[in-house]
């Protein structure tokens, strides 16, 4: 029995002691060297990116995403500290259907946050240069390939639903209370715990219909460029106390607190970011243009028609 315990201890020690990549370089290959070991990380379609709203193309043909079985209540999920973040497994009965009808089966979701040196913002995607407080990635694989392992290296193999977070000083989000309370059970890499009575839809923002979308990659090695990203416009709110707890609860492979676990934004490289909604500035510009055109129609047509009649009349003579 003691021998078995020793083997198990060595196994978990190995998990904690080794990681082949990291964000800072303190434990494994740092972000600036990822491309040396993982060539795709230096590719032309990398994620995350800064979404510049003035350059976003409105595509009215993009339908709202269909999140099937996300609303199922009181399910159980396995939550794991993988040494980089907290990951929660999702069942294959949940899937995302995109605007063109492609079905992507759910795999898992995980978080990215800040916290180091009092840095509260830790999202990966930024909007007009602004980094949000946190970001969650709901990872899905294309049903066409059967399994995640088959899909992860294939064209159009993956789809990720990105959820941004904002902070409210005191407004606790009770839908996240169980997840945050369970963090103490997975302090070290390799540890798992079970979430009970959880409804995934409650973890998303109220509005899941409006989104930005673009072709990109995984944001961690191997940075495979086969991901269609869907970044929701609406955000989830957490209290400051909840965010601070998340930032200071779990350890990495070097027994350091996991903080600032996000990748820097990558060059857009002429990719088109689309949205299925008009932003406020676009709506204002469109409305202003509409009013100007209406004003022209009201003031000018009568004079023009009269002039044309007169010309026609005199031409007969």
From Swiss-Prot:
The keyword Secreted applies. Disulfide bonds join 41-223. InterPro entries: CA_dom, CA_dom_sf, Carbonic_anhydrase_a-class. GO terms for cellular component: cytoplasm; cytosol; extracellular space. GO terms for molecular function: carbonate dehydratase activity; zinc ion binding. Glycans are attached at residue 255. Substrate binds at residues 219-220. It holds the Pfam family Carb_anhydrase. Major constituent of saliva. It is an enzyme of class 4 (lyase). CDD domains: alpha_CA_VI. Keywords: Disulfide bond, Glycoprotein, Lyase, Metal-binding, Secreted, Signal, Zinc. Residues 19-277 form the Alpha-carbonic anhydrase domain. It is found in: Secreted. Its cofactor is Zn(2+). The keyword Iron does not apply. Its EC number is 4.2.1.1. Zn(2+) binds at residues 110, 112, 137. Its main location: secreted. The active site is at 84 (proton donor/acceptor). One of its GO terms (biological process) is detection of chemical stimulus involved in sensory perception of bitter taste. Residues 1-17 form the signal peptide. It catalyses: hydrogencarbonate + H(+) = CO2 + H2O. Belongs to the alpha-carbonic anhydrase family. Reversible hydration of carbon dioxide. Its role in saliva is unknown. This is Carbonic anhydrase 6. The gene is Ca6.
């Amino acid at each position: 029995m003691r021998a078995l315990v020793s083997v198990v201890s060595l196994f978990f020690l190995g998990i904690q002691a080794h990681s082949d990549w990291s964000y800072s370089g303190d434990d494994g290959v740092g972000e600036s060297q990822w491309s040396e070991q993982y060539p795709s990380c230096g590719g032309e379609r990398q994620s995350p990116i800064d979404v510049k709203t003035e350059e976003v193309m409105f595509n009215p043909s993009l339908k709202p995403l269909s999140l099937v079985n996300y609303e199922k209540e009181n399910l159980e999920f396995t939550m794991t500290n993988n040494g980089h973040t907290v990951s929660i497994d999702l069942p294959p009965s949940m899937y995302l259907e995109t605007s063109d009808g492609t079905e992507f089966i759910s795999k898992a979701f995980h978080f990215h946050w800040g916290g180091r040196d009092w840095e509260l913002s830790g999202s990966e995607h930024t909007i007009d240069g602004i980094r949000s407080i946190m970001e969650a990635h709901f990872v899905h694989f294309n049903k066409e390939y059967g399994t995640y392992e088959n899909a992860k290296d294939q064209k159009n193999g993956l789809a990720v639903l990105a959820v941004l977070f904002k902070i409210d000083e005191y407004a606790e989000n009770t839908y996240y209370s169980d997840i945050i309370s369970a963090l103490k059970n997975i302090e070290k890499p390799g540890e798992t715990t079970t979430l009970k009575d959880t409804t995934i839809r409650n973890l998303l923002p109220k509005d899941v219909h409006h989104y930005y979308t673009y072709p990109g990659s995984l944001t961690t090695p191997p940075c495979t460029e086969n991901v269609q990203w869907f970044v929701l416009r609406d955000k989830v709110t957490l209290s400051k106390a909840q965010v601070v707890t998340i930032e200071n609860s779990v350890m990495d492979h070097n027994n350091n607190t996991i903080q600032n676990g996000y990748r820097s934004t990558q060059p857009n490289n002429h990719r088109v970011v689309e949205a299925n909604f008009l932003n406020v500035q676009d709506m204002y510009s469109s409305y202003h243009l509409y009013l100007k055109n209406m004003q022209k129609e009201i003031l000018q047509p009568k004079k023009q028609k009269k002039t044309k009649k007169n010309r026609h009349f005199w031409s007969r003579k």
